[in-house]
């Protein structure tokens, strides 16, 4: 029997990291030494207190039920972390939601924001899901190019006026994967001004702010005045705590965006484990 599948998949092959993992395993089987420069999976173990807490929580039968809402203690911990780590004070529970890793969040949030044909601006180069998520939701993905001559920062004056006016959502990420650059304070201020001018929702992927070297400081988009008015930030435990396989992240920021995203996710899952 011959099936007809969704045409939206015609533009996609298997995810690049799955493909590279297969090739890596084949080389390892052949006795080759492989340095894995593909998906960013830390090869360090999580801190002992983290593993102990997970082990203890996994031994409690009540933790195997549906987690229909985030625990207040969890939301408090996220809010307190943002205050202590980034100086972002006063984040309310309504401005936080847990997700199955930032990859999942980025893949689904366009369902809450974009109608088919809406324009989403994504960086080039950029992480694959920045493009895949909006595209699979029917949005029109348009790239903005990042150049080494400008330290891979967005050149807002190079984004055409007509494109900016059509854009509904814009994905930004600093420190940026795969080019490992950070952004100065003036950049974030310009980003917020740009978003307000064109009424664009900003999604900031903040997965790498705790693994920065050379005297640089990882910052949160939300620490800048007006950020919560224009968007949300994805904060991941994967790289900061060597917690990649457990799939634990948060989306933090604008309550209206998070409320709509909660609505979407309530249709498709029942919360994170532990």
What do the PLM-derived regions correspond to, one by one?
Residues 118, 139, 194-201, 227-229:
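A short helix->loop->beta-strand "cap" motif at the edges of active sites that frequently abuts
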Residues 2-3, 8-101, 108:
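N-terminal small-domain helix-loop-helix segment of the aminotransferase-like
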Residues 112-134:
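Conserved PLP-anchoring active-site segment centered on the Schiff-base-forming lysine
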Residues 90-96, 116-119, 166, 228-231:
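Short acidic capping loops at alpha-helix termini that bridge into adjacent secondary structure
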Residues 142, 147-215:
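Active-site phosphate-binding strand-loop segment of PLP-dependent enzymes
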Residues 27-30, 137, 197-198:
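Helix C-cap/helix->beta junction micro-motif
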Residues 47, 230-274:
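PLP-dependent aminotransferase class I/II
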């Amino acid at each position: 029997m011959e099936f007809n599948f969704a045409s939206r998949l015609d533009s996609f092959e298997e995810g690049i990291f799955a493909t590279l993992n297969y090739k890596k395993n084949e080389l390892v089987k052949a006795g080759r030494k492989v340095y894995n420069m593909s998906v960013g999976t830390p090869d360090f173990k999580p801190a002992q207190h983290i593993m102990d807490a997970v082990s203890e929580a996994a031994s409690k039968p009540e933790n195997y039920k549906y987690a229909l809402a985030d625990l207040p203690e969890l939301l408090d911990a996220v809010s307190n972390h943002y205050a202590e780590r980034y100086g972002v004070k006063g984040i309310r529970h309504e401005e936080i939601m847990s997700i199955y890793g930032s990859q999942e969040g980025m893949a689904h949030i366009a369902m809450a924001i974009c109608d088919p044909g809406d324009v989403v601006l994504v960086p080039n180069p950029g992480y694959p899901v920045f493009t895949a998520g909006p595209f699979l939701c029917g949005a029109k993905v348009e790239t903005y190019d990042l150049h080494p001559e400008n330290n891979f920062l967005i050149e807002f004056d190079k984004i055409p006026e007509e494109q900016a006016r059509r854009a509904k959502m814009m994905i930004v990420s600093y420190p940026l994967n795969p080019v490992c650059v950070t952004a100065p304070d003036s950049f974030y201020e310009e980003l917020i001004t740009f978003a307000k001018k064109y009424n664009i929702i900003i999604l900031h992927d903040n997965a790498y702010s705790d693994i920065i070297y050379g005297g640089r400081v990882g910052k949160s988009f939300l620490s800048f005045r007006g950020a919560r008015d224009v968007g949300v930030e994805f904060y991941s435990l994967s790289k900061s705590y060597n917690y990649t396989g457990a799939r634990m992240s948060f989306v933090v920021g604008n309550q209206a965006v998070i409320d709509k995203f909660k609505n979407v996710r309530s249709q498709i899952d029942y919360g994170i484990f532990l």
